[in-house]
Swiss-Prot record:
InterPro entries found in the cross-reference section: Actin, Actin/actin-like_CS, ATPase_NBD
Alphabetized UniProt keyword annotations: Acetylation, Actin-binding, ATP-binding, Cell projection, Cytoplasm, Cytoskeleton, Nucleotide-binding, Nucleus
Designated name of the protein: Actin-related protein 2
Function statement: ATP-binding component of the Arp2/3 complex, a multiprotein complex that mediates actin polymerization upon stimulation by nucleation-promoting factor (NPF). The Arp2/3 complex mediates the formation of branched actin networks in the cytoplasm, providing the force for cell motility. Seems to contact the pointed end of the daughter actin filament. In podocytes, required for the formation of lamellipodia downstream of AVIL and PLCE1 regulation.
Family note: Belongs to the actin family. ARP2 subfamily.
GO CC annotation: Arp2/3 protein complex; cell projection; cytoplasm; nucleus; site of double-strand break
GO molecular function, one term: ATP binding
Principal subcellular localization: cytoplasm
ATP-binding among keywords: yes
Residues engaged in binding ATP: G160, D161, G162, R214, M215, I216, K217, E218, G305, G306, S307, T308, M309, Y310
Modified residues (N6-acetyllysine): K299, K322
Lineage, opening ranks: Eukaryota, Metazoa, Chordata, Craniata, Vertebrata
Length: 394
């Protein structure tokens, strides 16, 4: 609460999950899938203890997804369907989750770097006009990650469900000219895993079984340190084969797919995406920075988001960065490599890092009026109120 007794809400709207709670807390109150579903056919009114409604959101929609036509309002960090997004926010602020009177609350929202200004304008408009929050702030996700890690300078590799971005932050300022975005993230890896399992002969439906395959991915996938060696193991032995029991009782065996699916992060061509993978993108980003700041960046690489949770990802990233540095900067001089200092921070709670940073920031700033865009300012200026955050509104 701020000094006037208003609740300060923090809402990290991800492409795949909404993480919401209050300023100052060290864990989200609620984490639920960012999906909206509508029944394909209305035959039953109840499944178990869940009543089937014309519109199902979040946890309930996820449980009954096989009977629903499911939509994700966000794709690659950008809101694609505003009506569904509002349903998601109604659910977040309503009795099912936070149960707040939005008129007496302030809210801190998050967004990926390089998001279109139009997206941010619309968010602010909805927050003030539909929900009438007393104060709103929109923060860049990468900066919040560093706050949660107690840093002001570093490079954040944030990979969630919809988008991966590499965002250098120097002395508390994100550097948009150096920020790189890769539209490969958790959802694409799940899709690729479905494709690989179909090739193995298992029958999966792209939409109905999506969540099931996502769970297989989270339980069994990892990033290979040495890809040739992993492929050899997959072909010649059964060391990598693991069994997984599906919700309907079927048992499937997953082998080489365990490392092949996340490999798309490092080799985008596997899923027909042009461009370099996450390791080379990170290297290019740091090398494009001012020469005086590079060593600071190499020493403070922070992983964030659910798609950085694969076992083996930090060590593979480090290996590829060293290799690229050796080839392109040291021109193959192995002797000098010992002077190259690199540190990848992989905090155990990195899945919720953005929320944690938001909760810290909102708590520090809860009584600072010049930090928040207020409802009164919005009534006077409209979306131009965003200029307070340093956004140019044309």
């Amino acid at each position: 609460m701020d000094s006037q007794g208003r609740k300060v809400v923090v809402c990290d709207n991800g492409t795949g999950f909404v993480k919401c709670g209050y300023a100052g807390s060290n864990f989200p109150e609620h984490i639920f899938p960012a999906l909206v579903g509508r029944p394909i056919i209305r035959s039953t009114t109840k499944v178990g203890n869940i009543e089937i409604k014309d519109l199902m959101v979040g946890d309930e929609a996820s449980e009954l997804r096989s009977m629903l036509e499911v939509n994700y309002p966000m794709e690659n960090g950008i809101v694609r369907n505003w009506d569904d997004m509002k349903h998601l926010w109604d659910y977040t602020f309503g009795p099912e989750k936070l149960n707040i009177d939005t008129r007496n609350c302030k809210i801190l929202l998050t967004e990926p770097p390089m998001n279109p200004t139009k997206n941010r304008e619309k968010i602010v408009e909805v927050m003030f006009e539909t929900y009438q929050f007393s104060g709103v702030y929109v923060a860049i996700q990468a900066v919040l990650t560093l706050y949660a890690q107690g840093l002001l300078t570093g490079v954040v590799v944030d990979s969630g469900d919809g988008v991966t971005h590499i965002c250098p932050v120097y002395e508390d300022f994100s550097l948009p000219h150096l920020t790189r975005r890769l539209d490969i993230a958790g959802r694409d890896i799940t899709r690729y895993l479905i494709k690989l399992l179909l090739l193995r002969g298992y029958a999966f439906n792209h939409s109905a079984d999506f969540e099931t395959v996502r769970m297989i991915k989270e339980k069994l996938c990892y990033v290979g340190y040495n890809i040739e060696q992993e492929q050899k193991l997959a072909l010649e032995t059964t060391v990598l084969v693991e069994s997984y029991t599906l919700p309907d009782g079927r048992i499937i065996k997953v082998g080489g797919e365990r490392f092949e699916a996340p490999e798309a992060l490092f080799q985008p061509h596997l899923i027909n995406v042009e461009g370099v993978g996450v390791a080379e993108l990170l290297f290019n980003t740091i090398q494009a920075a001012d020469i005086d700041t590079r060593s600071e960046f190499y020493k403070h690489i922070v992983l964030s988001g659910g798609s950085t949770m694969y076992p083996g990802l930090p060590s593979r990233l480090e290996r590829e960065l060293k290799q690229l540095y050796l080839e392109r900067v040291l021109k193959g001089d192995v002797e000098k490599l010992s002077k190259f200092k690199i540190r990848i921070e992989d905090p155990p709670r990195r899945k919720h890092m953005v929320f944690l940073g938001g909760a810290v920031l909102a708590d520090i700033m809860k009584d600072k009026d010049n930090f928040w865009m207020t409802r009164q300012e919005y009534q006077e200026k409209g979306v131009r109120v965003l200029e307070k955050l340093g956004v140019t509104v044309r």
